[in-house]
A protein has these predicted regions:
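The feature captures the conserved acid-bearing segment of alpha/beta-hydrolase catalytic domains
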Residues: 138-177
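Short beta->alpha connector loops
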Residues: 13-16, 104
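Short, structured coil segments at secondary-structure junctions
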Residues: 27-28, 119, 174
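Primarily recognizes the serine-hydrolase "nucleophile elbow" in alpha/beta-hydrolase
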Residues: 82-141
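Cap/lid segment of the alpha/beta-hydrolase catalytic domain
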Residues: 23-24, 29-78, 135-142
Length: 177
């Protein structure tokens, strides 16, 4: 439909699954872009995602955990920022109101995206994950994926990597509601 519209980026929680797109929040009133993070089509049969989750993408959050540049989340964060670029390139986008939302892993990606891109004007982060991983050392609960509970005490490279992608470090950079 002709006109200029606000936009909404939806980033996913953890897992490997299909996405149908958000056609229900504000149909005809907002541009919505819902993205996956794994670089695979989001419209395949559930059995394909189940096989990937149990195989090639099993524990994807640990991939490259010895280097912030090789970390799985490096590509994921860049992808979220590129999604903002794409929205901003649309002639239908009003150039004023751009939100990002997600829960758990998506909540973390919402915070990170809003902290890194000033074009994001609002966010809705629902129980963001990837937070305060070092709470493990203080015998406190930490955020998903609980790296050190399941994988043991980290070496210095792993610790540096999880610190780099810790949502708490991005939250302090937020300038949007």
């Amino acid at each position: 439909k002709e006109g200029k519209y606000p936009a909404w980026l939806r980033v996913p929680g953890a897992g490997v699954r299909p996405y149908a797109g958000d056609t229900y929040t504000a149909p005809g009133k907002v541009i919505t872009l819902e993205v996956g993070i794994h670089g695979i089509p989001v419209t395949m049969q559930q059995s394909v995602y189940d096989a990937l989750a149990g195989g090639a993408l099993s524990n994807y959050w640990t991939f490259g955990r010895d280097s912030r540049d090789a970390s799985y989340y490096n590509r994921v964060v860049v992808g979220a920022l590129r999604a903002v670029d794409f929205i901003c390139s649309l002639p239908q986008y009003n150039g004023k109101a751009l939100g990002v939302t997600g829960s758990s892993q998506g909540g973390a990606l919402s915070v990170i995206t809003a902290a890194l891109d000033s074009r994001v004007t609002f966010l809705a982060a629902v129980h963001p994950a990837l937070c305060d991983h070092e709470a493990f050392f203080k015998k406190r609960a930490c955020g998903w994926p609980h790296y050190f509970y399941y994988y043991g005490a980290p070496d210095e490279k792993q610790l540096e990597t999880v610190r780099y992608y810790d949502t708490a470090n991005f939250a302090r950079l937020l300038n949007v509601p």
